[in-house]
């Protein structure tokens, strides 16, 4: 910051003098004001600083004081104290010399910054006469400037230590005065007492150190005028007592928690001199101290290491401890009383004025000098800025001073301006940014009561679709300001040493796939390179579902020939041969056994016959086996017989289940309607590709007519995506939010922002049904497959008969899955009723979303929402058929 010095008509502008920095500006400017001559003409009186009137009143009092009259009489009589004074009794030090007078040496006054000669100092200490320049002939009606302010009424630098000493930074002056006082006390104590008793004139030093506190107010007014002209605020100085205004290194406040470094201070000499000068101003100092007692009490405790105790002068007749104050800071101290400061410092609290009611002040700290403004500390006004938060509840973001609804903190009254979407019942949302915050500003909805919360506020299964729950450990470091622009996944559980799920034999549910941060929001490898569906027999690339299992073409042909043929294969080894892509032809017996174990069969009716054939083959080879091999054969038999309880096609459903698909949403950008809906459309396009692959791998689906296959997928894709999203929300975020994708999770704010809040609420309710009904992964897989065959045109499909048979087979498979877990027929019937009611509830949600997407497609150009090509074609061609009633869902129960 560069500021030209100048106070208008208060004093002449120095030619092109510039100071840099915030702190030296103030002190250097005041020094320039004092050292430059002020106005000397009558018209300059109107441009005097605000303290001019106060100076005139004090000057009038000084003129009538008996001491000044005595000094004036002594000056007229030619006494040694005949100093030249101004019209108001001030000590004139900088006046111009008269041409008629001989040019004398410049006066060396301690307050002028120059060091007097030793002889002059001794003479001044002993009260010897000194020559002073002649008075000026100009008009002296205007108040004198410069050091004439330091007249004979100056109170001895005691009460104005924070004003004059800090402004001029003349600590050496006090040392010189103290030395002179010691010389005067030691060498001329008797003569001094005699002169005081007889009313004899005293030295100029004694007169200089006597009087009232005129300079204190004058220096304050002058300091304020200079600071206002420079654009600096000095109101922070007014809130500190004089003892706390010593100038120091206030640019760099001590680090919190680190003991302060002791500053070099003028110890004993200055302390003794100051102790002797504080006698006549003790009352005022006491009042100033009591005025800020709440602040100074806690402030002094932290500065006990900086206090300096010194004994007073013996001549002063008092001995005490002098406590040097702390350094001066132009920034507001954290322990100051905020109430008084907010009334006068509007420009200082400019951010606070925009932020609404101020937060409670932080606990006092001995070195909390520099104000660290945090927008999260401004209470209710943070609601407007916190609307950009996408992954956290507002109640979990604000600090201890700003409380959300239901937090119970002192600033809960400001919760009226909080966004109405965030209620206390919503609980902890996705990825709390602030955590418990020491219990003060924890997440809303009871997160703060629980203290430390998990980083997600929920538990999710560690792997797969299992319902096992595992707790997360809170991450060590969160982002600053409570701002969460990245998804805070806990690093210990995200960094994996093994290969990702897309490298396994099949994609699986991708239960553990998480992205570290928003910068890692890249698509998984299965998006660029779709995972190769491996054959369950040899591990080669699978070509589809053959005979009830996902196999390659070679194993498909082998099983057909081996199962239909009459050949009996025997293993030359121990029935544990390795069957892979390169060694699958080495042992037909082990290969056929592995086909049976994978669930391959020529038909459901032949399952028992195939089991007997397998037992016969193993029985014929049992004569040459050991007891260990016989135990292994019994386990194989029991495993084959168990297929009657574990449906065969469940293995296929688990193998062909699509993996997790990312939306490619940029979470670093603020949420908007267009961005959220465009990301949802992009996610729908990517998921639709996986739905097509998944449907083609379903048992019996390829037997449908090609047109029927396309029609079924185009009509049921919305319901399938909603059903799968509800399951992901249940398994990943405990149905608290909508888990569309790892990089696109909808909390309450996003639900409102997307303008589809009612649809999102219904989808979240569907996700909660999975938990209330305790849906198992096997039931979910079968219900999802059945949902594909639950909507058809009113006119029917081209091969409606086969479609009905295929749908009935999937209904029977669902009933068989229910019967495997329950032995009571009544319990099975009740469970079947619950699951079918859940399937029926998906259709109204899908229809409502069809209407929303169709309306959005029409207005997409106006709202800047992007639709991928395939999504736009399906919505524009097939969705109108559903909305018009030409295509209707198939319900299990009457609606």
UniProtKB/Swiss-Prot annotation:
Cross-link (Glycyl lysine isopeptide (Lys-Gly) (interchain with G-Cter in SUMO)): 371, 496
PROSITE patterns: NR_LBD (PS51843), NUCLEAR_REC_DBD_1 (PS00031), NUCLEAR_REC_DBD_2 (PS51030)
Functional description taken from the UniProt entry: Steroid hormone receptors are ligand-activated transcription factors that regulate eukaryotic gene expression and affect cellular proliferation and differentiation in target tissues. Transcription factor activity is modulated by bound coactivator and corepressor proteins like ZBTB7A that recruits NCOR1 and NCOR2 to the androgen response elements/ARE on target genes, negatively regulating androgen receptor signaling and androgen-induced cell proliferation. Transcription activation is also down-regulated by NR0B2. Activated, but not phosphorylated, by HIPK3 and ZIPK/DAPK3.
Region Interaction with LPXN, annotated ranges: 527-894
Molecular function in Gene Ontology: androgen binding; beta-catenin binding; DNA-binding transcription factor activity; estrogen response element binding; nuclear receptor activity; steroid binding; transcription cis-regulatory region binding; zinc ion binding
Gene assigned in the entry: AR
Region named Modulating: 1-533
Record PTM: Phosphorylated in prostate cancer cells in response to several growth factors including EGF. Phosphorylation is induced by c-Src kinase (CSK). Tyr-510 is one of the major phosphorylation sites and an increase in phosphorylation and Src kinase activity is associated with prostate cancer progression. Phosphorylation by TNK2 enhances the DNA-binding and transcriptional activity. Phosphorylation at Ser-65 by CDK9 regulates AR promoter selectivity and cell growth. Sumoylated on Lys-371 (major) and Lys-496. Ubiquitinated. Deubiquitinated by USP26. 'Lys-6' and 'Lys-27'-linked polyubiquitination by RNF6 modulates AR transcriptional activity and specificity.
Family classification: Belongs to the nuclear hormone receptor family. NR3 subfamily.
Site feature (Interaction with coactivator LXXL and FXXFY motifs) residues: 696
Top-level lineage group: Eukaryota
Keywords per UniProt: Cytoplasm, DNA-binding, Isopeptide bond, Lipid-binding, Lipoprotein, Metal-binding, Nucleus, Palmitate, Phosphoprotein, Receptor, Steroid-binding, Transcription, Transcription regulation, Ubl conjugation, Zinc, Zinc-finger
Chain sites annotated for binding 17beta-hydroxy-5alpha-androstan-3-one: 681, 728, 853
Zinc finger (NR C4-type): 535-555, 571-595
Protein localization: Nucleus; Cytoplasm
Keyword NADP: no
Region (Interaction with KAT7): 600-894
Name of this protein: Androgen receptor
Domain NR LBD: 644-875
Biased composition (Polar residues): 201-211
Record carries keyword Zinc: yes
Crosslink (Glycyl lysine isopeptide (Lys-Gly) (interchain with G-Cter in ubiquitin)) position: 821, 823
Region feature (Interaction with ZNF318): 1-562
Disulfide bonds: none
Principal location class: nucleus
Domain comment, as recorded: Composed of three domains: a modulating N-terminal domain, a DNA-binding domain and a C-terminal ligand-binding domain. In the presence of bound steroid the ligand-binding domain interacts with the N-terminal modulating domain, and thereby activates AR transcription factor activity. Agonist binding is required for dimerization and binding to target DNA. The transcription factor activity of the complex formed by ligand-activated AR and DNA is modulated by interactions with coactivator and corepressor proteins.
